[in-house]
Amino acid sequence: MSEQAVEVSPKCLGPQHHINPLRFVMPPGSWDTHFHVFGPTTKYPYSETRKYTPPDSPFEEYVKLMLALGIERGVCVHPNIHGPDNSVTLDAVERSEGRFLAIVKIAPDVTLPQLKEMKKKGACGVRFAFNPEHGSGELDTALFDRVVQWCGELDWCVNLHFASNAIHSLAERLSQLTIPTLIDHFGRVHPTKGVDQPDFKTLVDLMRLPHMWVKLTGADRISRNSPSYQDVVPLARTLVDVAPDRVIWGTDWPHSGYFDVKRMPNDGDLTNLLLDFAPSEEQRRRILVDNPSRLFGQVAKGA
């Protein structure tokens, strides 16, 4: 890791260690479909092109969160700060004793044999994160089209993270896919603009297609009502109504990219939002257990 990289990438905060009490009990077999593992950097150095530098949030710390929340299975999403070297994520999967799967980040010159090797280690999909916070803001369509074809051969999903207004240029391409297609963080739509805004209406239209999935994650990243996040509730309920069998949930731990301690979310508060997003136990069971189990298959063993 170069001194220059450390200088140009500001240090952000780590997650809160205190977890506010849950107001409901997670159903048996619950999944966290979106979390990251960072470091330790002595073993897994950060990419020199990262946009910020978080503290270590290693495998052991995430397992503590799992146990505290009552999560049994998980999908470890490879973070941009580690670049296209997926070692930290795949090692977490290996250490999980069958509880985790991985969604990986790829280099532009990735090959199908490389993806096949990652599948053997527990990878189940590829993530394209090109929102301005992490990338160029534009999708590499040539790479995307090539990798999506390989994902089909591997029975993988494809995962996208983009700025809300990018959905209009992406909609036609995404609508034509035939593999499970996951959209992160409510599509990053702005909740203060309501459910009738063009960005959200386009997301809802996509969610009517049988291969499209959305993650009810990162409410803190789009909300203007911290720490209650109630402005996100109408978006969540709309998505649950439109596609009750294709919405999933995740913690987004360890909540990287925050520099203001007042904005750092509490994992208990974020998890309790499920009571507002999905008021009935049946809805929550679908989101936490049935939907992710069907999407990711019966690969991960119970805790």
UniProtKB/Swiss-Prot annotation:
InterPro entries for the chain: Amidohydro-rel (IPR006680), Aro_Compnd_Degr_Hydrolases (IPR052358), Metal_Hydrolase (IPR032466), SML-Hydrolase (IPR053519)
Transmembrane segments: none
Cofactors: Zn(2+)
SUPFAM superfamilies in the cross-refs: Metallo-dependent hydrolases
pH dependence: Optimum pH is between 7 and 7.5. Approximately 30% of the maximal activities are still detected at pH 5 and pH 9.
Regulation: Completely inhibited by ZnCl(2) and CuCl(2).
Record key words, sorted: Hydrolase
Gene3D superfamilies registered for this protein in UniProt: Metal-dependent hydrolases (3.20.20.140)
Reactions the enzyme catalyzes: 4-sulfomuconolactone + H2O = maleylacetate + sulfite + 2 H(+)
One Gene Ontology molecular-function label: 4-sulfomuconolactone hydrolase activity
Source taxon at top rank: Bacteria
Subunit description: Monomer.
Family designation: Belongs to the metallo-dependent hydrolases superfamily. Sulfomuconolactone hydrolase family.
Function, in words: Involved in the degradation of 4-sulfocatechol which is a central intermediate in the degradation of substituted sulfonated benzenes. Catalyzes the hydrolytical desulfonation of 4-sulfomuconolactone to yield maleylacetate.
Protein name, UniProt field: 4-sulfomuconolactone hydrolase
Organism, scientific name: Hydrogenophaga intermedia
